[in-house]
Amino acid sequence: AQEYVKNDWAVISKRLQAIYALHFLTPYPKMMWQFGELGYDVSIEENGRTGRKPVRWNYFEDANRRALYDAMSKIISWRTDHEDYYGQNEVAVHTWSVGDGNMGGKTLVMDKVIVVANFNNAESTTTISNPNPGEWTNLLTGEKVQVGSSHTFTLGASDYIVLVRE
């Protein structure tokens, strides 16, 4: 078993971005805890479980926390802007592979969304079946990507990709 990185905010930020992409881009209502978009890391025990917690306004000054915020902003904005898609009674989720032991190949494949995440400390390759081959857009970079009906992604350690289709 590999040793997971627990104290490097560059790694933690990327993994949180991937987790939030997998979470917020699936159907049904979602909720986020205060400052969750910045990786709030104050213990629930601080000042008692229900006591006031410190506000960490300085989180915006940390580049990794800012990257987390920026990624979450794009992810949630895309979902909000596509309310017609998420508001359907049935949104087809073609693949949802997040519960297995393969930390390198977590995937979400829907008609308009593809998320592939690698939670390993090393590069990982994952192949997906895509029901909508053609041109997709990388949500975070704006880059256009051709994705076939069977497509292989190679992601670096703790990396992820979010592709969307209008």
Q: Where does each model-flagged region fall?
A:
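Active-site clefts of carbohydrate-active enzymes
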Residues: 1-9
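Carbohydrate-interacting/catalytic domains
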Residues: 9-13, 17, 22-32, 36-166
